[in-house]
């Protein structure tokens, strides 16, 4: 009974801390010219291009300002990279399957909102629909289901075979998400390939 109570309390704490919202709309959508702009942006210690465009690969540590940003194509937090997103930040993703934030193995995402100032990932359009953009994908090093007895199996993401996930580090840590809303994610490239991230 004590173990059941501890498991329940652990689950309740996680559910309270992680506020993921799947948003949907009955609208047919309108991309307003916000198509996927590619990934020609920053690399290294900054993924911010200009005033508010997020693009490229982060290999160092970066803290965003609490304001609105546009996610332009694929943004990757590479091994050794760390992205800190403060409370009250909104990130609007451009439309498309290639528009997503991926935390590679060894990368870290700290998105710590509050009840009054959540962090919002959403579509960059006035007429959003479910599946408008990819979402947030975290590729950790923890064992994956159905893995070998030694729990060392890894797999490759369907969306980009350059990035593996899984392994044998049961205590792996890819960061923290608290009071985060992720809306209109889950884009598909075909009937069989879609984003299944957060």
Language model features: what each stretch is:
Residues 24-198:
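Beta-strand/loop edge motif enriched in small/polar residues
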Residues 18-22:
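C-terminal motif of bacterial Sec signal peptides marking the signal peptidase cleavage site
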Residues 1-10:
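Bacterial N-terminal signal peptides that target proteins for export
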Residues 10-11, 168:
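Generic detector of short alpha-helix boundary/capping microenvironments
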């Amino acid at each position: 009974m004590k173990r059941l109570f501890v498991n329940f309390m652990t689950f309740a704490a996680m559910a309270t801390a992680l506020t993921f919202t799947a948003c949907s709309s009955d609208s047919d959508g309108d991309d307003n010219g916000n198509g996927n702009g590619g990934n020609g942006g920053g690399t290294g210690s900054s993924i911010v291009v200009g005033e508010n465009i997020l693009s490229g690969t982060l290999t160092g540590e970066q803290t965003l300002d609490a304001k609105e940003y546009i996610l332009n194509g694929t943004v990757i937090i590479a091994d050794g990279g760390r992205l800190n997103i403060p409370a009250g930040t909104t990130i609007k993703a451009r439309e498309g399957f290639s528009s997503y934030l991926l935390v590679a193995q060894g990368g870290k995402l700290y998105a710590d909102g509050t009840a009054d100032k959540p962090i919002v990932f959403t579509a960059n359009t006035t007429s959003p629909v479910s599946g408008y953009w990819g979402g947030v994908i975290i590729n950790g090093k923890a064992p994956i289901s159905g893995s070998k007895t030694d729990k060392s199996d890894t797999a490759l993401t369907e969306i980009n075979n350059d990035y593996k996930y899984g392994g044998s580090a049961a205590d792996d840590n890819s960061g923290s998400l608290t009071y985060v809303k992720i809306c209109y994610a889950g884009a598909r490239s075909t009937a069989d390939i879609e984003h299944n991230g957060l």
